[in-house]
Amino acid sequence: YRTSGVFICVKDRFNFPNGKSCGDICRADVRRAPPLPRAEGGAAAVGHESRRDFFEPSLAGFPFFTIFTYAKSSNVPKLRIIVGCMAGFSLLAAGLRVRAQPPHGVAFYDADCLYDTVPSPFGNDTRYLPQGEMRWTGERYRRKVMQTAAVIDSLGLPLVGLYGVENESVVRDVAAACKGDYAYLFRTTDSYNGLDFALFYFGDRFFPDRVEAGHFWMTAAGELRGAGRVCLLMSASDRYIGYKIEEHRRQHPDERLLVAGRTAGAEPQRCGLSEPLAAASRAGRGTRRAGNRWEMRSNVLIDTAFRVVRGDVYARRWLFDPSGEAPWATYTRRRYEGGPGANLPVFCYFR
């Protein structure tokens, strides 16, 4: 068992350095997350802890160890030793249950034009065809699908909103490429560019029962385990988001609202929403590079009924181009670069 970074063998009462195990009782590895990288050009490399990183129970001073020490060093009858052990394990299990409750998390990622290679009868995708202007081949498509899935897996949150996918076939390919056990929701919108939303979620954490979509927006409502009933509103337009928030508040006052995507047209304080990424924006961070500065194209707003734990831009070195100054775009104008996309994801933890 680990206490303050040291393994303690409760059988022989020996201390072992990190990374070692006793062989009789202790079988564990110490997980140590690597230091967060920092991207050049003004965007802080901000990461987040995965769900398992919050499961870090500290056993220092726990009665469990006192019971074992007392039992080994005194002439206590075996029955009392057994009772003491059982009590210790019960206290240990109760402590772990309390400490293991992770905060809830939501993320949003603009995949930056993830088209398939088949002509669409609904939208104008002629540029993104093998014979089109972008020379969008099957190999390039598969590479971007794998990169998008890697971003979702790296975020590792129960709710990950995705924008910029052409159809459900693309979403299905991304879900199949994900290593995490994600389910997905998809609805076709009436956008002129043929790009839609999808929601990737953990089926044991979120239980959706209502999905709606319209012109540059999509909502998914349901029970978020441990948080009650919530609704995630995703937006790809600053123009309509304020109206959609007010409409939702009128029609579903019992639902706690999460907003992700383009939110510049919203009035968060008037609508009972907090801005977890406000500090990051003031610090000059953003999701997309525009000339010599960063723009917060994607954002997250959280219902004030929740307490924000942390929110920021999600930046990793492999999401940046070789210069480290901007996100690694798939295309620069018409030149193929081979990156995941020109946008960085955003995320927020809340309780």
List each model region and its residues.
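Bacterial Sec-dependent N-terminal signal peptides
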Residues: 12, 53, 66-102
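Compositionally biased, low-complexity flexible segments
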Residues: 23, 27-50
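Active-site beta-strand/loop signature of hydrolases that rely on acidic residues for catalysis
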Residues: 106-111, 147-171, 232-236, 241-270, ...
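Structured beta-strand-rich core segments of catalytic domains in phosphoester-bond hydrolases
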Residues: 165-228, 235
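Intrinsic-disorder-associated, low-complexity terminal segments enriched in Asp/Asn/His/Tyr and depleted
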Residues: 1, 12-15, 24, 29, ...
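Metal-dependent phosphoester-hydrolase catalytic domains
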Residues: 247-258, 264-351
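N-terminal, active-site-proximal structural segment of metallo-dependent hydrolase catalytic domains
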Residues: 67, 98-177, 189
